[in-house]
From Swiss-Prot:
This is Syntaxin ufe1. Residues 1-297 are cytoplasmic. The chain crosses the membrane at residues 298-315. Its main location: endoplasmic reticulum. GO terms for biological process: protein transport; retrograde vesicle-mediated transport, Golgi to endoplasmic reticulum. Component of a SNARE complex consisting of ufe1, use1, sec20 and sec22 or ykt6. Interacts with sad1. The gene is ufe1. One of its GO terms (molecular function) is SNAP receptor activity.
Amino acid sequence: MTSRTNEFFGLTKNGDIDAANIPLKRISYTDPFLAEGYRIHETIVNLLVFLKKIRGAYLKDRTFSNVQRLSKPLMECSLEELSKLELDEVQRDEIEHEVSSAISSCIHQIAKLQEIVKEQQSQIPKKSGWLQGLRDPSKLSKKETLVAHHSSVLWYLQSELSDVSSVLYHLQDLRLKRGQEKRNIASDFLTKNPTDENSAVEIPESELQTFFTQQQLQELEQENDVLLQEFEHTMERLRDTGKSLADITRLQSEISAQLSIQSSAAEKLYDDALNVMDSLSGGNQQLIKAKSRSSRTARLLFCIFTVMGLLLLSLDRIV
């Protein structure tokens, strides 16, 4: 087949079409499966882009927030807007929770699509020998191609979702490690700081009234309560972060298991397609052999009848 690429480019030049100004059209699928798959794909891509844009603000060492200055949701902000963003610990936890919920929702939707593929696969008749392939090969091929395509779509969606969960897990892990490093540095500074004349001296509780007034003691108690609350809040955040990391690990395990199942299903479909091809090839060979046998029989009968005709003519002349 000759290449007509140059002819195509010539036609586009003659048409004076500016490809850059052609408006993009949203893909419209008549197949509900593909429409749902495209919607899940769009959600996953938006999550991945958001995590990459929010990475800088998420990992900043800040304890205050300026999110209220934004006029639109975080998902719709540009990279420049998010780079100037300041987040507190609560908002970081909210981002993790929202992304984890979106990942779980995508997993649930993909599971529904898997049930559709299983139902489609169950409708394909079992093959037993080459005669089964000769009954209606075009119809069987269409069904199997559709199932194989849908399985490939599921595999691709699960692969994308695995990438998103890996990015989120990496961000959470970095946040946890940095928090642990800061606490270790502060602890080392307090324990290794050499004692001097300004170092704190432990005062017996019975002598506190001598060194401090009642108001000073109340202020110290209040400061101590605040420090305890901050410590408890930090420990609670650590527990929540650990729980979130465990949830992400669980999600990754589920996605990996589903990817393995989809890979096995794709390999099975590929083997089935090869078996169909072998069956069709065997059927074609049988047809060729049958055709060859029938042609040989016809030639043999033609020769026999020709010889008999000649004999009859000869006998007629003799008589």
